[in-house]
């Protein structure tokens, strides 16, 4: 029973799919995809449930969402282990993901009140009231890299606002999605409020093109996001929120503590095996002896990074990539950069055939004349040496993306200069660029999104404002307009 529609667990009526542990190829979930007919049923269920869910009132909706939080807390060990099994991430990291899922509840409630609450202003003969109403039925498309946390960041604020949801997770992480829906079910969510459709591209197409959805919230690749954007062109009545990737730059300038700089570079480039949308893809280090010393220390540290399966002890820093296909893609990306003149300082290598395990790579692309503006979604960091700060910033901005960027520098003046000129939605100073606060918005510019920041600002795309002029009774004004006699 792989689909959750109208509060019932149903078997998919499409073809068989499975998910595998990318570290060893073991099958950990099997099921069948949702057909277009089942997608229709899920949307119909969400539509039928939506008005009653909205009319239940915010406090009652919040109580159910809080009950879901309690279910996450009660099942956090199982959820963390399942995320680790399906994604290949080490358990220390998946435990933090479940913690973020739990923490999202309070943050979403706070954001709902602050961003989309009700506000009343008195007028001489009445009042002006601002309220917010839900869009209706929204589709949520989840990614594989944070299969719990990222869709959770769309679903929770959508429900608080009064929307109902049809959730289509990544086909690579169906078991995590199944656990999430079991938690919602145990929380007492009314039938039809959240529906789960598992499947691959055809299931996604059926949902994205469904005429009865009022919006779509997507986290994933820029390529897929652009397809969705084209599909929704000419449909201004539907809300589309796109959270996509980036070719993210990290500049190092005048850092005294080189060990700390190395740590932040590694955390920026290689955490989650480089499979975070905010991961550093390009590293800019000054020419000269200080830069040489930093690179030597970085190379040494990269070679010491422990890579292993999600459950090995002691725990590795890097687990598996999501699949063998993804691992091979990174080997191919490295070969492409080498063919263009890049020189590998640390070779990225597939550890074991048939798995997604790879070692981290560092490649010097300073002499590559035309560096591809691609998001290589894995643990491959491109190094560029620069001669002056303006050149580094210019090169950092030479991308169609604009998600995250960072500066490691001792000088506040340098950071202010950088902050004013860099083009990105997340800009960090002396922090890893994979670090972001749930109490702040999360999103980028350019090919990284469509100006619908998520996290604390997710509330904004989950509801629309309703402005009202109100009075308790119909009454004549003290003075009639010229030319009127009543």
UniProtKB/Swiss-Prot annotation:
- Keyword hit for Transferase: no
MF-aspect GO terms: succinylglutamate-semialdehyde dehydrogenase activity
Q: In which pathway does it act?
A: Amino-acid degradation; L-arginine degradation via AST pathway; L-glutamate and succinate from L-arginine: step 4/5
User: What is the enzyme's class at the highest EC level?
Assistant: oxidoreductase
Q: Where does NAD(+) bind?
A: 220-225
Known catalytic reactions? N-succinyl-L-glutamate 5-semialdehyde + NAD(+) + H2O = N-succinyl-L-glutamate + NADH + 2 H(+)
Pfam families recorded for this chain? Aldedh
Q: Name one GO biological process term.
A: arginine catabolic process to succinate
The keyword GTP-binding is annotated on this UniProt entry: no
> Which keywords are on file for this protein?
Arginine metabolism, NAD, Oxidoreductase
Q: Which EC numbers does the record give?
A: 1.2.1.71
Active-site residues, Swiss-Prot/TrEMBL: 243, 277
Q: What does this protein do?
A: Catalyzes the NAD-dependent reduction of succinylglutamate semialdehyde into succinylglutamate.
By its UniProt entry, which HAMAP family does this protein fall under? Answer: Aldedh_AstD
Q: Which NCBIfam families match?
A: arg_catab_astD (TIGR03240), PRK09457.1 (NF006992)
Q: Which family does it belong to?
A: Belongs to the aldehyde dehydrogenase family. AstD subfamily.
Q: What is this protein called?
A: N-succinylglutamate 5-semialdehyde dehydrogenase
Lineage from the top down?
Bacteria, Pseudomonadati, Pseudomonadota, Gammaproteobacteria, Alteromonadales
